[in-house]
Amino acid sequence: MKRILLALLRVYKIALSPYLGSQCRFLPTCSDYARDAIVHHGAARGSWMAACRLCRCHPFAQGGYDPVPGTEADTPVHAATGHAPVAIRLPRP
């Protein structure tokens, strides 16, 4: 099922997306978000996450950066160093 969904997304990106133009207010785009969600969370949960994202993507949405939860893109990165913050555990006194 996962391969079928990913193939359908590929067909959409190749056949329809160029004619519709870039209308997504989010980064990554909704189709990239759907692909990442299906790859990282499976067909059922990834499809649900993609459907919820499509409901958030409308002309009145503010948009912005909205990565798939639980992926590396979801990890905050320090702007100056490019490294993700690391929690350090100190020994208790």
Swiss-Prot record:
Keywords: Cell inner membrane, Cell membrane, Membrane. It is found in: Cell inner membrane. Pfam families: YidD. Its main location: membrane. The keyword Cell inner membrane applies. GO terms for cellular component: plasma membrane. It is a peripheral membrane protein. Belongs to the UPF0161 family. NCBIfam families: membrane protein insertion efficiency factor YidD. Could be involved in insertion of integral membrane proteins into the membrane. This is Putative membrane protein insertion efficiency factor. It comes from Cupriavidus taiwanensis (strain DSM 17343 / BCRC 17206 / CCUG 44338 / CIP 107171 / LMG 19424 / R1).
